[in-house]
Amino acid sequence: MEQIWLLLLLTIRVLPGSAQFNGYNCDANLHSRFPAERDISVYCGVQAITMKINFCTVLFSGYSETDLALNGRHGDSHCRGFINNNTFPAVVIFIINLSTLEGCGNNLVVSTIPGVSAYGNATSVQVGNISGYIDTPDPPTIISYLPGLLYKFSCSYPLEYLVNNTQLASSSAAISVRENNGTFVSTLNLLLYNDSTYNQQLIIPSIGLPLKTKVFAAVQATNLDGRWNVLMDYCYTTPSGNPNDDIRYDLFLSCDKDPQTTVIENGRSQRGRFSFEVFRFVKHKNQKMSTVFLHCVTKLCRADDCPFLMPICSHRERRDAGRRTTWSPQSSSGSAVLSAGPIITRSDETPTNNSQLGSPSMPPFQLNAITSALISGMVILGVTSFSLLLCSLALLHRKGPTSLVLNGIRNPVFD
């Protein structure tokens, strides 16, 4: 008897489930099941966290899109999602803007990650972890035959980015330099600018910078007399604000330099300057925008000794290196890691047939199917006509000599 009731219950569940799929991009053969972990996708974006939930399995479970809400806030319409039926399967989308991330009860936990840079400098980065859940409401009755749905999500960001993700954040470092007459402390800052004049700091639009946009960076020192200069040893980028991120792309290190990077000034004054073209990290391939953080390992050096600390890259400099006097370790300070970012870049889709040669003012010449067929037919007709002409000339050439000999019957009148 129990088996009959179980079979009847399964039949009742499957039939309404197929009917509930009407009007939505669902497949009864694929989505006649209860939700699983794979039915939610979480995208930790530049400006928002986006969650996409398989709506077909929600329908099969007996719920609608209005039954799902962030962190149990079922009475707040701002904490609900919306349906996108233009995908397969249909999904319910939830968006959490980083500027209002705690609006629907999301949890923010700040932690400090210690680390050591490649140069042995002790660093610590504060990271903010945003977590929460999406669930269905509890029934008002004591029991329920519907399963309770629960989806969890989590994203981590540098804390300085969460505090104000509309502006660039830059770190500063204090370097202590010991001299014969005492010790002084200088402050270094890494700033980003729009152009080579270094007058206006970089402003990133909400949609991000186009790829290959040139950005100008400068390391500026304060509280420094004329005997000391700024020397940038190593500048690199990471997809996060953590200078110790395993994923990094070097801009310049010693004599190795990215082709799109230009070192304008280094070791010659109290400011180091360079430029580079922005890019995107491949790990952000599923996102429309990418974050790039810039880091520079910088030190102070005496103005007279900075040339000896610069890398020897050209043959002439190697030849002249033997003439240089030796310098003492006291001629430079310790290194500091400076960071700036995030630089937000966007990936614009470019049509594959959008390239052309010649003057930009001339319209591109494109061949459609009809034009290609006409040109092919004309070429074939021309080749055939030329072949027939050659055959005709060959036949005439063969008959030419025989036509000069006259044959006939002798007329007796002329005898």
UniProtKB/Swiss-Prot annotation:
The chain crosses the membrane at residues 373-393. Residues 394-415 are cytoplasmic. Residues 325-336, 350-359 have a biased composition (Polar residues). One of its GO terms (biological process) is vestibular reflex. One of its GO terms (cellular component) is extracellular space. InterPro entries: ZP-C (IPR055355), ZP-C_dom (IPR042235), ZP-N (IPR055356), ZP_dom (IPR001507). Keywords: Cytoplasmic vesicle, Disulfide bond, Extracellular matrix, Glycoprotein, Membrane, Secreted, Signal, Transmembrane, Transmembrane helix. Disulfide bonds join C44-C155, C79-C104, C235-C296, C255-C313. Residues 43-320 form the ZP domain. Detected in placenta, kidney, lung, pancreas and at very low level in other tissues. It comes from the Eukaryota. The keyword Transcription does not apply. PROSITE patterns: ZP_2. Glycans are attached at N121, N164. The record marks R319, D320 as: Cleavage. Gene3D superfamilies: Zona pellucida, ZP-C domain (2.60.40.4100). Glycoprotein which is a component of the gelatinous extracellular matrix in the cupulae of the vestibular organ. This is Zona pellucida-like domain-containing protein 1. It comes from Homo sapiens. The lineage of its organism: Eukaryota, Metazoa, Chordata, Craniata, Vertebrata.
